[in-house]
């Protein structure tokens, strides 16, 4: 399982651990990923995703999974999230 957020595309970064004596050693900064279940209002279905805490706050701020995916760029989304977005768009098109 890769350490990449399925909604925002956040991935590990590299940098230095700097000691008090200014010694530098390489380290990785990992994203704060959580396994969550999000519910689509349009589809009435739940989806399990591995997303960062920041992405979870953004989903909540935008008003749910459907609203988040409507604004999200496809290149930042995982394959699974893109499929969910396509399903939601299809369901909204048939409902309209």
Swiss-Prot record:
Sequence similarity: Belongs to the bacterial ribosomal protein bL28 family.
* Assigned GO CC terms: cytosolic large ribosomal subunit
> Which InterPro entries does the UniProt entry name for this protein?
Ribosomal_bL28 (IPR026569), Ribosomal_bL28/bL31-like_sf (IPR034704), Ribosomal_bL28_bact-type (IPR001383), Ribosomal_bL28_sf (IPR037147)
What pairs make up the disulfide bonds? none
Q: In the UniProt record, does the keyword Ribosomal protein occur?
A: yes
A GO MF annotation of the entry reads: structural constituent of ribosome
Using the record, list the residue span of the signal peptide; answer none if the entry has no such feature.
none
* Record protein name field: Large ribosomal subunit protein bL28
Query: What Pfam families would the database entry show?
Result: Ribosomal_L28 (PF00830)
- Output the PANTHER family linked to this UniProt entry: 39S RIBOSOMAL PROTEIN L28, MITOCHONDRIAL, LARGE RIBOSOMAL SUBUNIT PROTEIN BL28M
Using the UniProt annotation, give all residue ranges assigned to the region (Disordered): 1-23
Q: Which GO terms describe its biological process?
A: translation
**Which keywords are on file for this protein?**
Ribonucleoprotein, Ribosomal protein
């Amino acid at each position: 399982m890769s350490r990449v957020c399925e909604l925002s595309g956040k991935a590990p970064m590299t940098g230095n651990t700097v000691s008090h004596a200014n010694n530098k050693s390489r380290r990785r900064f990992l994203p704060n990923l959580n396994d969550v279940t999000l519910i689509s209002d349009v589809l009435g279905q739940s989806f399990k995703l591995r997303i960062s805490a920041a992405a979870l706050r953004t989903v909540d701020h935008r008003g749910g999974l459907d609203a988040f995916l409507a604004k999200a760029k496809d290149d930042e989304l995982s394959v699974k999230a893109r499929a969910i977005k396509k399903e939601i768009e299809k369901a909204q098109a048939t409902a309209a």
